[in-house]
Amino acid sequence: MKKTIFTGLLMLITALAVNAQNLTGKQWCTVLNDEDGQGIAVALTFEKNGSCGMLIATQQDMKEDGVPITLIAAVTVPGSYKRDGSNLNNQFNNGKAKVEVDYEIKGMDAKTKVLLDKQIKGEISTLKKEFKQVLLDGMPKMDQLKIVSLESKKLVVRNDDDQEIPFYVE
């Protein structure tokens, strides 16, 4: 009898450890659409020490003086999390969010590209603030998540707005 109870407890502990291990040490990725249908890539990471992170990235094609430019913006937001069964309580520190903006200029001669490079680099700091605000404001709430399902390569969570969001390990 004692051996059966011990074996059952051991199996339960092992299952819980495997379940917890499935969440940590991976980058969970998904693509969401904003109000304009623009794709926003989101990645979540959870570490065993209780830290977590969120990476939000988007690409925007635009024209500057008739010249096609592709902007790529990414916001990295650090945080921490606590897991209580199927509940994930995340605290993301938007104040410590870091923004990176990169760009590609298409179809230009080298001389004009250098001039446009200087102009764009001057506007990057303004763009960083705008992208940070737009990306953080446009995101679904990720503070209180309920794990709907957790598999080795797929995580489905439900947020406070009752949206189910699937994430995948790539």
Place the predicted regions along the sequence by residue.
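Lipid interaction determinants
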Residues: 19-170
